[in-house]
Amino acid sequence: MSSNIPAELKYVASHEWLRLEEDGIITVGITHHAQELLGDIVFVELPEVGANLAAEEQAGVVESVKAASDVYAPIAGEVVAVNEDLPSAPETANSDPYGAGWFFKLKPANVADYDVLLTAEQYAGEVD
C-alpha cells in the first residue's frame, strides 16, 4: 500500500482523512491524493468554530492554481477548532497534508460513525 495513505487514519471517498485523537476529538484534513490532484494550493476557507455540521456537509473550500474544491465534514459533529495557520500558509496542505496541513477538528455527534469509514486499504482501492 502507498506510504501516502497512512494506515492509522480513516478516509472518505471525497478525499478527506480523519484521525481519532485520544480525547475523542476527530482531526480532519485532505488526503495526499487530493492535494496531488489539486496542485499548488493557494487559498483555504475553513468552517466556523462552533458550527454543527452534518455528515457530508460542505465544511470549507480549497483552491489551487488549477481548481477549486469543497471540503466536507466526513461525519456529523461540532467544529471545536480550525487550523488558524492554514489560511496564511495554504501550501502546508500540499507539503504536510497529514500533519501541519490539517483543516479542522470535530467533536463527533456519534463516535461510532468513525468506525464505519474507509480504512487505508479501502481508500487505496478507491483512488487506484
Curated annotation (Swiss-Prot):
Keywords: Lipoyl. GO terms for biological process: glycine decarboxylation via glycine cleavage system. Binds 1 lipoyl cofactor covalently. InterPro entries: 2-oxoA_DH_lipoyl-BS, Biotin_lipoyl, GCV_H, GCV_H/Fam206, GCV_H_sub, Single_hybrid_motif. Its cofactor is (R)-lipoate. GO terms for cellular component: cytosol; glycine cleavage complex. It comes from the Bacteria. The modification N6-lipoyllysine is found at residue 66. Residues 25-107 form the Lipoyl-binding domain. It holds the Pfam family GCV_H. The glycine cleavage system catalyzes the degradation of glycine. The H protein shuttles the methylamine group of glycine from the P protein to the T protein. Belongs to the GcvH family. The glycine cleavage system is composed of four proteins: P, T, L and H. This is Glycine cleavage system H protein. It comes from Neisseria meningitidis serogroup C / serotype 2a (strain ATCC 700532 / DSM 15464 / FAM18). The gene is gcvH.
